[in-house]
C-alpha cells in the first residue's frame, strides 16, 4: 500500500503470479468499510449510522455519499473493469456473516447491491486467467472525493509507470529527510531507531498535529 504525495488516495498495489504448471482461473475480491469521519458515528451510535450515508456504482467506481457532510464523498475503484460489485455490507458478508466466511466469496459472485442508508462497504470482483509463470498486477484505489475525482485518479494510476513513480518519489523524499542527520553507534538496531524510525514518527506527528 502507498499514498502518493499530494493526492488523497491510498493505492493497494497487488501482484498475483501463477507459480504452478497449470492454467489458473482466479477471482480477485476487494473488501473495505467506509468511515463516517466521526468517531461517535463510527464506533458508538450504530443506529444513527444507518441513516448517515448512501452508496452507488457507475463506470467501475463505488461512491459513498456522506449525508451529514455537504462535500463528503469517498470512492473505491481499480485499474480494471470489475466483473461484479457490492456496496452493502450485509450483501457481501451475508446476514449475520463475518469477514471469516463472507457470503460473496462463498457464492463466487457479487450481487450488485447499493443502498441509501444502511451499512456500506467497497467490494469489487475481477475474474482473470493466468498461464503458468504469468503474473497479473492490480491497483485498487481508495480515496476522498466524488465519482469525478475517482475517474481522474483511476485514469492516472491505471498507468503502472505512474504507480512505480510514486515509490521512487517517496524514496527520494525520505532519503532527503534522513540525510539531514545521521548518527552511527555500535548497535545497528539503535542506528535504525535514531536515523529512521524516530525521524519518521516526528514527521508524521508534525503532519497531523494541527488536524
Outline where the language-model segments fall.
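Beta-strand-rich interaction surfaces with strong enrichment in secreted/lumenal proteins
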Residues: 1-2, 111-115, 125-130
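Polysaccharide-binding surfaces and accessory modules of carbohydrate-active proteins
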Residues: 1-107, 122-124, 149-180, 187
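Substrate-binding groove/exosite segments of carbohydrate-active enzymes
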Residues: 113-121, 134, 175-211
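Long, contiguous hydrophobic alpha-helical segments, chiefly transmembrane helices and signal peptides
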Residues: 10-12, 28, 121-124, 140-142, ...
Amino acid at each position: 500500500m502507498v499514498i502518493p504525495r499530494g493526492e488523497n488516495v491510498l493505492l493497494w498495489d497487488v501482484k498475483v503470479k501463477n507459480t504452478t504448471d497449470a492454467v489458473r482461473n482466479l477471482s480477485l475480491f476487494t473488501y473495505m468499510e467506509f468511515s463516517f469521519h466521526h468517531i461517535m458515528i463510527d464506533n458508538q451510535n450504530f443506529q444513527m449510522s444507518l441513516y448517515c450515508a448512501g452508496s452507488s456504482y457507475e463506470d467501475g467506481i463505488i461512491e459513498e455519499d456522506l449525508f451529514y457532510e455537504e462535500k463528503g464523498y469517498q470512492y473505491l475503484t481499480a485499474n480494471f473493469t470489475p466483473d461484479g460489485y457490492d456496496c452493502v455490507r450485509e450483501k457481501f458478508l451475508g446476514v449475520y456473516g463475518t469477514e471469516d466466511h463472507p457470503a460473496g466469496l462463498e457464492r463466487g459472485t457479487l450481487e450488485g447491491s447499493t443502498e441509501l442508508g444502511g451499512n456500506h462497504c467497497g467490494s469489487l470482483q475481477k475474474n482473470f486467467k493466468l498461464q503458468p509463470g504469468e503474473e497479473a498486477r492490480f491497483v485498487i484505489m481508495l480515496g476522498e472525493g466524488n465519482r469525478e475525482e475517482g475517474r481522474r485518479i483511476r485514469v492516472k494510476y491505471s498507468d503502472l509507470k505512474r504507480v512505480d513513480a510514486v515509490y521512487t518519489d517517496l524514496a527520494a523524499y525520505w532519503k532527503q529527510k534522513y540525510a539531514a542527520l545521521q548518527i552511527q553507534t555500535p548497535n545497528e538496531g539503535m542506528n535504525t531507531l535514531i536515523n529512521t524510525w524516530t525521524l519518521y514518527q516526528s514527521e508524521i506527528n508534525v503532519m497531523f498535529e494541527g488536524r
